[in-house]
């Protein structure tokens, strides 16, 4: 079942070896181990740009995985692939779904904000100013949530919030 590593990246190989050892010695059930192997294989495929293979692995992991936190990361990674393929609406669905399992998944909050900001820019370019404002407001809401959880990670988002007058005192550094 484990995917063979195509690249010669020392860190990736080391991670894979250590992860395999940990999974073997952890007192966990067979399904959790199987889900982890699919997830790990999905990450390896995703890092190599093999998105179809990665998605197949993630969907298998999702069928098996029971742990909400682990499900959130699987859904998040599916969202990353959808966004990479320009499927922003689908990416949003997966990011939102990941937040149902892990509301503090700061990366998903940020990526949702990025997509809403992108939509806002597109609408602004089309002179659809009211709709653009709604998208920018949505982006700011998600960035504020992300910044509250990780205040030093999203400096550009903080600057955008300041420049556009959307920053609130509870997130100012």
From Swiss-Prot:
| Entry coiled-coil feature ranges | none
Q: Tell me where it resides.
A: Plastid, Chloroplast thylakoid membrane
Give the membrane topology, semicolon-separated if more than one. Peripheral membrane protein
Do you know which SMART domains this protein is assigned to?
A: TPR (SM00028)
Question: TPR repeats: which residues?
Answer: 35-68, 72-105, 120-153
Which Pfam family, just one, is annotated for this protein? TPR_8
Could you state one GO biological process linked to this protein? photosynthesis
Q: Which UniProt keywords apply?
A: Chloroplast, Membrane, Photosynthesis, Plastid, Repeat, Thylakoid, TPR repeat
| Family under the similarity heading | Belongs to the Ycf3 family.
Q: What does this protein do?
A: Essential for the assembly of the photosystem I (PSI) complex. May act as a chaperone-like factor to guide the assembly of the PSI subunits.
Listed name of the protein: Photosystem I assembly protein Ycf3
> What organism is the protein native to?
Cyanidium caldarium (Red alga)
Q: Which gene encodes it?
A: ycf3
